[in-house]
Amino acid sequence: RGAPISSDIQARARDARYELMTQWCLAHGFLHLLLGHHREDQAETLLLRRERGSGVYGLAGMPEIRESGAVRILRPLLSMPKARLRATVDALGLDVIEDPSNDDIKFSRVRIRQGLKRKNQDASIAQLNSEAARMGASRTTFECVVANALARTCVVYPEGYCLLNWRGL
């Protein structure tokens, strides 16, 4: 079984992939990067973050839309089951590249994935995605409250600084 890997090499590899894809988008004039994360990915993310003691932001899972510098990251398939996505990809004859680390139980995400498979997967995944949606709504509400407070109380100057009227909060 091997000892769990604590260096989070998967996160670093993911960050490197995102950087490469973002640079490709910028070089080719694309403003949006669409990713194929699906319903099971969202459930795994929620469980992984819960295991690590995350708060509301982490328990909201992956956002469907994330501003990331010059490129907006979109995840339009978060509510789609993996089996349906795979069937569509197969029907279209698209090539799939499988990351071998996706089956390596040294990684927390892989152990979580296997645990979901042993349970009533559909019910668990639906419940986890519902929880992520509720946390996402809480996160969005919080962000709106903060943005409105800043809009009312903060003056941004072209010189690159801002003043905050604390009494207006």
Residue ranges and their predicted role:
Residues 107-110, 122-133:
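The feature marks non-catalytic terminal segments
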